[in-house]
């Protein structure tokens, strides 16, 4: 994959801890920017990889985040306060992490960089019986979580170098398991 340098904010989290080893095995150089809020060691298996580095930082630290953004080819913003209950507990924190971080990234990314942004299906809000969502389905988020993620996607889509992915509920085994998801009780 050439010498692409990838920055993954929140890279030690549920999705990142599965994605980062895959990126490394595909030949990318990967930097994880994470505050390790859950005190996890989810990247232990890759910590000695020669193309891996970690910045123990908070995405609300503007200067630290900017320094990393400008030195990478691909940015994958995974850092987030995830789910409606967590966002409702601290709406200000959720806005800062889920939206303001992305607004800042959009200011610092150059035309030669790429942003890959996973978005939640919570942006759709409550669906209608018998109607399936697709790319053209109107977004009507009802939770603060969905609202911040949809607003972040809107900011990024104004740029030309962005790909967004609307993910359904992500589930399954991960080095940083999410035990707050009912679906993971069945995995």
What are the residue ranges of the model-derived segments?
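Catalytic helix-loop patch of NAD(P)-dependent Rossmann-fold dehydrogenases
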Residues: 89-92, 96-104, 123-164, 169-178
């Amino acid at each position: 994959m050439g010498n692409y340098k990838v920055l993954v904010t929140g890279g030690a989290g549920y999705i990142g801890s599965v994605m980062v080893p895959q990126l490394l095995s595909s030949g990318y150089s990967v930097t994880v920017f994470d505050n390790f809020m859950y005190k996890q060691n989810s990247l232990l298996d890759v910590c000695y990889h020669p193309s891996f580095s970690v910045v123990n930082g908070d995405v609300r630290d503007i200067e630290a985040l900017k320094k990393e953004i400008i030195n990478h080819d691909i940015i994958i913003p995974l850092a987030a306060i995830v789910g409606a209950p967590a966002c409702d507990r601290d709406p200000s924190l959720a806005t800062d992490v889920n939206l303001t971080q992305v607004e800042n990234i959009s200011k610092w990314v150059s035309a030669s960089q790429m942003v890959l942004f996973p978005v939640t299906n919570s942006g759709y809000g409550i669906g209608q019986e018998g109607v399936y969502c697709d790319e053209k389905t109107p977004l009507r988020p009802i939770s603060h979580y969905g609202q911040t993620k949809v607003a972040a996607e809107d900011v990024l889509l104004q740029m030309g170098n962005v790909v967004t992915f609307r993910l359904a509920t992500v589930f399954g085994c991960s080095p940083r398991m999410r035990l707050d998801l009912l679906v993971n009780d069945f995995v």
